[in-house]
């Protein structure tokens, strides 16, 4: 089981990158990707709802090859972090993902900062481990406001940046806590790189691979 981190795209809803979970089983011969970033782009007022957190998102499943081809075609970086999990933990994580993708469970209330494709990664890992991850925040996070975090991926003079500023209001200048950095996939990537499991004190990531340099 591994975490896939995708680089930024060229439209607002892809500007911050993407996160997904890959499950590969050579015995049963499947290689699939679960991601929590499915939405109806054609819904009325999509971008305003996007930043205000008024959308329903879904978890979806796709073949890895199809997933890879899509993002390779968009010339977006794809980095894979293979997780250092036991067989029991891998089975538990896969079972969690299969439960989440059931029709009655797959829809969730999207929130720009607190409930998106990136935050779901840490949530799923900690649920599987039944314990919080251990990491040194000084190696991973800076003291930055939400505005600074957003503008690291958006041109501050763009309409997208302006629209997010307006939609998020005064909150945008608050300093983000460690957990509040994790709405951005790149910070989830950094968190996992520097994390250890609480019970065994071993690195969470066994191997990091650059699958598609952009």
Residue positions per predicted region:
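Soluble extramembrane regions of membrane proteins in the secretory/endomembrane system
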Residues: 1-213
